[in-house]
């Protein structure tokens, strides 16, 4: 693959295969062969070029006898020698949508056995203790509970508990209980939904308020609101509920905003005098000496008051993220530190990142500026996995270990995280759901080379001989994920691999168990005069929907790829006619131009855009003017539009 100066233009010269296989666990594995000229259909190429890691709840457990869910992490490095394609693929755990209430009870710990775990759980999650004395009493009795950020598992459990509570009482909206009912009417609500959560009732109460109070998600404060907030603060003091009601915001929101608001705050770069003053105040209030590491036990409100020119948030951030590290002689953070951080967290063998003691982890690490800074560094690393919020923590760690250990020359990595439920029957919806993001790339070879491709039903070879065909059946549709440009490739009737290879030199994408259907889209591309096919693109790709004019009245969702019309294939025979295409003249045939008879067939190709994608304009195909629509320049579509004009 030769890449020009413009990164969006890629010229592919060689022929390579992309092989999808499916193991016994239902995991999709993508094989990336090297450009070494080996026969892609030979047995030697079946040796996997990836490494797989299986994770299960109990090692050695028979998967057929287990009701647990198993996860696999598959990583595929793209090396310098493998220039055939670029692929980014991720997969998340998918569960059956229809679960019986008994199954929900088992998974959420609502059954009687879960409630009998011990008095330590009930003592914490069933008590309204808010004072230090109450907490000390429970600690002295040996009780422990979780603090800090809520994990995905905790939030899922809380939401399930709320849904069950509402279902049992015939209530539709939880806001009726939280904001409208009296304390007497909702007295058992918080104790019921806190079951299985090792957190105090007050923590559950605060979490629920933040989740369901719409006033907590209003947005950034305007200058007018700031001025009004100052007036209300002078009038009502610390009556946050009254202030929040007057502003249309939650009490916690106005409290946090007032805490960070200060009229005398400077902005921008800190001066040397401000840094010196901050260091003096911190060491004075904590009783430490210059050069000592101070990360805990600091009243930042008091620090800000004595510094005078910065808010407590500014003081805290400046000290923990820079000044403390600078004065103690710290070193710079490197790529090796990224690897060590993931390794050290994995060695802790914790089930959730909230169990990590960042003070201990940061201790003695010269390049760590503070425990808080180290935690933010971890957040930056884990965001490299787009669906990190949906993955169990051990699975996320396994994937991240391969990502951070990649050398600079192999920055492009393919991370596949698959899962299956051992006893779950295949669901028509969740049989195979994989979020996939694959840039379109085309190779161009002679027909003889293309006919020599392997007949393996799980291998796809993009060969362009005299004609190249892509067939997309209506049984496929794309379900958007939370990540822009990434979608679920979803099949409806089978769990087998949804891609097969046709026997001819053309390429067909079809569902293995789906019958042939006349409602399909066939996109044809002619051979070019040159030996190379140039594809202009950027990441991520696009979805092309083809519909007839009578269907344009119905809105088309971005989440579904449907074929409503067949684009007619051009044949070299002069005697063959087609009602959808006017017979071209001899001169037009030499130029490869075609004219559509708009009175017979009216079709529209809808380009569903995604961030960063584009397609060259037909008016000036050689210029830099582009439309933010697609990624693929198709000769047929260009000639059709030129003929129509």
From Swiss-Prot:
<dbReference type="InterPro" id="IPR046775">
    <property type="entry name" value="DMTF1_N"/>
</dbReference>
<dbReference type="GO" id="GO:0000981">
    <property type="term" value="F:DNA-binding transcription factor activity, RNA polymerase II-specific"/>
</dbReference>
<keyword id="KW-0043">Tumor suppressor</keyword>
<comment type="function">
    <text>Transcriptional activator which activates the CDKN2A/ARF locus in response to Ras-Raf signaling, thereby promoting p53/TP53-dependent growth arrest. Binds to the consensus sequence 5'-CCCG[GT]ATGT-3'.</text>
</comment>
<comment type="similarity">
    <text>Belongs to the DMTF1 family.</text>
</comment>
<keyword id="KW-0238">DNA-binding</keyword>
<dbReference type="InterPro" id="IPR001005">
    <property type="entry name" value="SANT/Myb"/>
</dbReference>
<feature type="compositionally biased region" description="Acidic residues">
    <location>
        <begin position="36"/>
        <end position="46"/>
    </location>
</feature>
<feature type="compositionally biased region" description="Acidic residues">
    <location>
        <begin position="95"/>
        <end position="105"/>
    </location>
</feature>
<feature type="region of interest" description="Disordered">
    <location>
        <begin position="34"/>
        <end position="71"/>
    </location>
</feature>
<feature type="region of interest" description="Disordered">
    <location>
        <begin position="568"/>
        <end position="645"/>
    </location>
</feature>
<dbReference type="InterPro" id="IPR009057">
    <property type="entry name" value="Homeodomain-like_sf"/>
</dbReference>
<dbReference type="Pfam" id="PF20588">
    <property type="entry name" value="DMTF1_N"/>
</dbReference>
<protein>
    <recommendedName>
        <fullName>Cyclin-D-binding Myb-like transcription factor 1</fullName>
    </recommendedName>
</protein>
<keyword id="KW-0805">Transcription regulation</keyword>
<feature type="region of interest" description="Disordered">
    <location>
        <begin position="95"/>
        <end position="119"/>
    </location>
</feature>
<feature type="DNA-binding region" description="H-T-H motif">
    <location>
        <begin position="300"/>
        <end position="323"/>
    </location>
</feature>
<dbReference type="GO" id="GO:0006357">
    <property type="term" value="P:regulation of transcription by RNA polymerase II"/>
</dbReference>
<keyword id="KW-0804">Transcription</keyword>
<dbReference type="InterPro" id="IPR017930">
    <property type="entry name" value="Myb_dom"/>
</dbReference>
<dbReference type="GO" id="GO:0000978">
    <property type="term" value="F:RNA polymerase II cis-regulatory region sequence-specific DNA binding"/>
</dbReference>
<dbReference type="GO" id="GO:0005634">
    <property type="term" value="C:nucleus"/>
</dbReference>
<keyword id="KW-0010">Activator</keyword>
<feature type="domain" description="HTH myb-type">
    <location>
        <begin position="262"/>
        <end position="327"/>
    </location>
</feature>
<keyword id="KW-0539">Nucleus</keyword>
<feature type="compositionally biased region" description="Polar residues">
    <location>
        <begin position="615"/>
        <end position="625"/>
    </location>
</feature>
<feature type="domain" description="Myb-like 2">
    <location>
        <begin position="333"/>
        <end position="382"/>
    </location>
</feature>
<keyword id="KW-0131">Cell cycle</keyword>
<feature type="compositionally biased region" description="Basic and acidic residues">
    <location>
        <begin position="587"/>
        <end position="597"/>
    </location>
</feature>
<dbReference type="Pfam" id="PF00249">
    <property type="entry name" value="Myb_DNA-binding"/>
</dbReference>
<feature type="domain" description="Myb-like 1">
    <location>
        <begin position="219"/>
        <end position="257"/>
    </location>
</feature>
<keyword id="KW-0677">Repeat</keyword>
<dbReference type="InterPro" id="IPR051651">
    <property type="entry name" value="DMTF1_DNA-bind_reg"/>
</dbReference>
């Amino acid at each position: 693959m030769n890449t020009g100066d413009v990164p969006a233009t890629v010229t592919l010269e060689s022929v390579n295969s992309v092989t999808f296989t499916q193991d016994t666990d239902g995991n999709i594995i993508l094989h990336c062969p090297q450009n070494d000229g080996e026969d892609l259909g030979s047995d030697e190429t079946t040796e996997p070029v990836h490494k797989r890691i299986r994770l299960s709840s109990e090692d050695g457990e028979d998967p057929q006898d287990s009701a647990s869910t198993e996860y696999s992490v598959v990583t595929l490095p793209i090396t310098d020698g493998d220039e055939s394609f670029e692929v980014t693929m991720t997969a998340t755990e998918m569960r059956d949508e229809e679960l019986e209430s008994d199954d929900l009870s088992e998974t959420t710990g609502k059954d009687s056995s879960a409630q009998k775990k011990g008095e330590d759980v009930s003592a914490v999650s069933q008590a309204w203790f808010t004072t230090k004395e109450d907490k000390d009493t429970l600690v002295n009795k040996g009780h422990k509970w979780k603090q800090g950020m809520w994990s995905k598992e905790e939030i899922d459990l809380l939401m399930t508990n709320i849904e069950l509570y509402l279902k049992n009482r015939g209530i539709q909206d939880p806001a009726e209980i939280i904001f409208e009912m009296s304390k007497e009417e909702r007295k058992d609500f918080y104790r019921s939904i806190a079951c299985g959560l090792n957190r105090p009732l007050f923590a559950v109460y605060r979490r629920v308020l933040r989740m369901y109070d719409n006033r907590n998600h209003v947005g950034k404060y305007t200058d007018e609101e700031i001025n009004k907030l100052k007036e209300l603060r002078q009038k009502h003091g610390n009556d946050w509920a009254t202030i929040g009601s007057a502003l249309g915001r939650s009490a916690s929101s106005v409290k946090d905003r007032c805490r960070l608001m200060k009229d005398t705050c400077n902005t921008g770069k800190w001066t040397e005098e401000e840094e010196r003053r901050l260091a003096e105040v911190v060491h004075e209030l904590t009783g430490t000496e210059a050069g000592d590491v101070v990360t805990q036990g600091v009243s930042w409100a008091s620090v800000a008051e004595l510094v005078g020119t910065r808010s407590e948030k500014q003081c805290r951030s400046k000290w923990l993220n820079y000044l403390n590290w600078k004065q103690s002689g710290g070193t710079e953070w490197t790529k090796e530190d990224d690897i060590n951080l993931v390794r050290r967290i994995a060695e802790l063998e914790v089930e959730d990142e909230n169990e990590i003691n960042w003070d201990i982890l940061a201790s003695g690490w010269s390049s760590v500026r503070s425990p808080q800074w180290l935690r933010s560094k971890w957040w930056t690393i884990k965001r490299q996995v787009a669906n990190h919020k949906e993955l169990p923590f051990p699975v996320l760690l396994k994937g991240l270990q391969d990502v951070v250990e990649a050398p600079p020359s192999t920055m492009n990595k393919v991370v596949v995280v698959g899962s299956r439920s051992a006893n779950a029957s295949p669901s028509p919806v969740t049989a195979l759901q994989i979020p996939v993001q694959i840039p379109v790339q085309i190779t161009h070879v002679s027909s003889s080379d293309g006919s020599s491709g392997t007949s393996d039903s799980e291998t796809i070879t993009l060969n362009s001989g005299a004609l190249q065909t892509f067939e997309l059946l209506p049984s496929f549709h794309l379900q958007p994920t939370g990540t822009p440009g990434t979608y679920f490739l979803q099949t409806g009737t089978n769990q087998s691999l949804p891609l097969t290879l046709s026997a001819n030199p053309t390429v067909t994408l079809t569902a293995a168990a789906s019958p042939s259907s006349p409602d399909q889209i066939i996109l044809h591309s002619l051979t070019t005069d040159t030996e190379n096919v140039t594809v202009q693109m950027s990441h991520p790709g696009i979805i092309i929907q083809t519909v007839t004019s009578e269907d344009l009245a119905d809105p088309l969702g971005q989440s579904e790829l449907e074929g409503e019309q067949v684009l007619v294939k051009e044949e070299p025979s002069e005697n063959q006619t087609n009602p959808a295409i006017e017979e071209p003249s001899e001169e037009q045939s030499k130029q490869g131009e075609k004219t559509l008879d708009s009175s017979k067939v009216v079709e529209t190709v809808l380009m569903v855009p995604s961030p960063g994608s584009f397609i060259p304009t037909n008016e000036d195909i050689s210029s830099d003017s582009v439309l933010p629509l697609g990624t693929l320049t198709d000769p047929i579509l260009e000639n059709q539009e030129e003929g129509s004009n």
